[in-house]
């Protein structure tokens, strides 16, 4: 290009549209600045459907059976531009669905197939998702036909379910209800590597995988199929499998069922040298129209496809459910070889002709079946082998285990069963769905007021009631829709024993509420009483500040039992930090203020909502252990804006005592008048948060602060109430 003839930048207004043309950004200048972007992602401005769009309502209009039939027909309609292996797209769609759902991790509930994020970077370009762009394009005519009635998120997952059915495999149902996002998520930490497939970069010590990651390398869904760091060791591969599947919430039996069941279908693709493969979708040229991995080897498709670099089918009948995977796994000895692409894999020693697989394009041509290092782990690991041999001898048990594990895989990030849509939702409740009994009572406004009076007359303080309600509700994670106040699992193990919940105080509060419950003429759940107690305390605190308010309350929560609660499964919800209660379990490599932002994002809060809640919780004395850090008021228990007023007081100078503790000294006398944590001070330090804090510190916004605090409070209290459409705004009248 002749640079002398290149036009100047046409953006006179200074707007820029790509990193190359954006100049030096704030992030370039201050790479360690607090990232608040995750609190404003998925803004309505990016959603083409508009605020009024109701996916559940649209889905109710769907001809579900017709949709499934169209998917079945598509699977047998091989397209010249991307032909189906063995004449059936079923295995391809299973991989697409598995890789959509399989990014889920229990550590923070992020990932999974619940948002259709496989359409966007980085997932659409991960090496492990190679050529799945073609699977999504194959589905486009169906999405185009059914339009708003089926989300991409649901369709990507449903397609694999239909594929298993169509190939004779076992499924136990399907729940729809996944709503699409419209740009990549910014809150998910996929790792810190700058390149794909970099080996053990995310490990430390004795192969300890970084939390909350659930894949061994950047760009993989789970494990390296060639073995750890590409070394073909089945025993060491078993360690990686157990850890990564465990971080997705799967036990050994579920893991074996999924691997064996998934590899009953289809084949791996590594027909030639991977140098023939072009860039991933995000790096592909504009004329590729979002398709990546263009392949110049042979025809570039069919038997010439290059994806993972591994090559071959696992069974002799790769489009039919059977016990062939275990038959071959235990029926032969396996020798190490390499695929045409140079990847380590295993072939059977002297296989019978009946155990050879058909060629992807010509069923009359037979090719060797293969096993991957991770497949052989199911034979060489002692625990996996026991399960595998049991499944081999009991095909019906294997089929049932696979169907249940597959359903769990597809639905693990969807939260409670109340969110499921469609005619195929199983009647059975599964413990991983965190079931909560439904309630059959209603409360009149008068009864609610009577209950609030009883709670406020019980001797419990505003701080105790607010802290307990917050502890119950704030376990909610919008990532996988788990936690929350419904179920009152704060009464049960493990939550009742969590340090952050101050077990002695919690036991006292619950005892008082249970005593009130026992004296009532009608059934009211403890879950409702916990939330109502917090709401009553907020109303009392607002009244003390001069505002008569009604905190909206919607009864209808149930009380879960210990038998309905997976103790190990709930352990991952224990907060290691909760800035709203000024709690930090220990010092971490991530700052307390970053952990606050992460917590706020999981609660689905905006920056203003987070700010209002922090100010209110400090005023109400809701700190862990009753500490005075950040309690910038002489009227604890009164819902004032004192936190913001005193934080922004230029008469106070702040000095560090240690990493997470600061003293505020009077500039004139040098006297220590306040103490604070990093979470407190970030609302005066960060320019964005300070701007919001200034709004709430204004003399004319005392009422606005109360109103905004209540709105954010109710949002958290009702975060898991999927039966409620909208929270009513607090009715605020200044006294």
UniProtKB/Swiss-Prot annotation:
Essential cofactor(s): heme b
Crosslinked residue numbers (Tryptophyl-tyrosyl-methioninium (Tyr-Met) (with W-98)): 222-248
Cofactor note: Binds 1 heme b (iron(II)-protoporphyrin IX) group per dimer.
Protein's name in the database: Catalase-peroxidase
Role description: Bifunctional enzyme with both catalase and broad-spectrum peroxidase activity.
Top EC category: oxidoreductase
EC number(s) per entry: 1.11.1.21
Region (Disordered) location: 1-27
Entry keyword Transit peptide: no
Keyword terms, alphabetized: Heme, Hydrogen peroxide, Iron, Metal-binding, Oxidoreductase, Peroxidase
Placement of covalent cross-link Tryptophyl-tyrosyl-methioninium (Trp-Tyr) (with M-248): 98-222
One example of a Gene Ontology biological process annotation: cellular response to hydrogen peroxide
Example GO molecular function: metal ion binding
Family label: Belongs to the peroxidase family. Peroxidase/catalase subfamily.
């Amino acid at each position: 290009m002749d640079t002398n003839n290149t036009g100047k930048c046409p953006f006179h207004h200074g707007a820029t549209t790509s990193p190359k043309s954006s100049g030096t950004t704030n992030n370039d200048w201050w790479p360690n600045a607090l990232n608040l972007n995750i609190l404003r992602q998925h803004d309505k401005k990016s959603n083409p459907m508009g605020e009024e769009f109701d996916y559940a309502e649209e889905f109710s209009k769907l001809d579900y059976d017709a949709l499934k039939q169209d998917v079945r027909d598509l699977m047998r309609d091989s397209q010249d531009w991307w032909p189906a292996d063995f004449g059936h797209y079923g295995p391809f769609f299973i991989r697409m669905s598995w890789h959509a759902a399989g990014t889920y991790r229990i550590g923070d509930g992020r990932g999974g197939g619940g948002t259709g994020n496989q359409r966007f970077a980085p997932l659409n370009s991960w090496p492990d998702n190679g050529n799945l762009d073609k699977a999504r394009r194959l589905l486009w005519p169906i999405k185009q036909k059914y339009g708003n009635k089926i989300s991409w998120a649901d369709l990507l997952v449903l397609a694999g379910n239909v594929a298993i059915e169509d190939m004779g495999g076992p499924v136990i149902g399907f729940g729809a209800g996944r709503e699409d996002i419209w740009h990549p998520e910014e809150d998910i930490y996929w790792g810190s590597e700058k390149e794909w497939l970099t080996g053990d970069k995310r490990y430390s010590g004795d192969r300890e995988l970084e939390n909350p990651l659930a894949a061994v390398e950047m760009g993989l869904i789970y494990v390296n199929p060639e073995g750890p760091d590409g070394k073909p060791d089945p025993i060491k591969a078993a360690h990686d499998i157990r850890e990564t599947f465990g971080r997705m919430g799967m036990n050994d039996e579920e893991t074996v069922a999924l691997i064996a069941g998934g590899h009953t279908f289809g084949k791996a693709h590594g027909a030639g040298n991977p140098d023939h493969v072009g860039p991933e979708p995000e790096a592909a040229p504009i004329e590729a129209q979002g398709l990546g991995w263009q392949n110049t080897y042979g025809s570039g498709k069919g038997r010439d496809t290059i994806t993972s670099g591994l090559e071959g089918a696992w069974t002799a009948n790769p489009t039919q459910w059977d016990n062939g995977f275990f038959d071959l796994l235990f029926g032969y000895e396996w020798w190490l070889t390499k695929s045409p692409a140079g990847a380590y894999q295993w072939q059977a020693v002297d296989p019978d002709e009946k155990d050879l697989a058909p060629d992807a394009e010509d069923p009359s041509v037979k090719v060797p079946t293969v096993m991957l290092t991770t497949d052989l782990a199911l034979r060489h690991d002692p625990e996996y082998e026991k399960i595998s041999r049991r499944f081999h001898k009991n095909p019906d048990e294997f089929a049932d285990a696979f169907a249940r594990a597959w359903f769990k895989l597809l639905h693990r990030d969807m939260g409670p069963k109340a969110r499921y849509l469609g005619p195929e939702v199983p009647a059975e409740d599964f413990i991983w769905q965190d079931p909560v009994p439904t309630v059959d009572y209603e409360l009149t406004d008068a009864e609610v007021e009577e209950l609030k009076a009883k709670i406020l007359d019980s001797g419990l303080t505003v701080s105790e009631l607010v802290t307990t309600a917050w502890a119950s509700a704030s376990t909610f994670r919008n990532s996988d829709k788990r936690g929350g106040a419904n179920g009152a699992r704060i009464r049960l193990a493990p939550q009742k024993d969590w340090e952050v919940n101050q077990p002695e105080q919690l036991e006292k509060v619950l005892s008082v509420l249970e005593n009130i419950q026992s004296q009532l003429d009608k059934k009211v759940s403890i879950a409702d009483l916990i939330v109502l107690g917090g709401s009553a305390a907020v109303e009392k605190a607002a009244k003390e500040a001069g505002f008569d308010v009604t905190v909206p309350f919607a009864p209808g929560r149930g009380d879960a039992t210990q038998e309905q609660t997976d103790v190990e499964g709930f352990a991952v919800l224990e907060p290691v930090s909760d800035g709203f209660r000024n709690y930090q379990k220990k010092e971490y490599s991530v700052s307390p203020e970053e952990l606050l932002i992460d917590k706020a994002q999981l609660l689905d809060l905006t920056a203003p909502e987070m700010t209002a809640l922090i100010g209110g919780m400090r005023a109400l004395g809701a700190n862990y252990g009753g500490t005075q850090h950040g309690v910038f008021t002489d009227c604890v228990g009164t819902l004032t804006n004192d936190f913001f007023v005193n934080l922004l007081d230029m008469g106070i100078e702040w000095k560090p005592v240690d990493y997470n503790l600061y003293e505020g000294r009077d500039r004139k006398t040098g006297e220590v008048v306040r103490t604070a944590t990093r979470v407190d001070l970030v609302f005066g330090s960060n320019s964005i948060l300070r701007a919001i804090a200034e709004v709430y510190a204004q003399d004319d916004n005392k009422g606005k602060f109360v109103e905004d605090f209540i709105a954010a409070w109710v949002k958290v209290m009702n975060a898991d109430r999927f039966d409620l459409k909208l929270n009513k705004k607090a009715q605020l009248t200044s006294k």
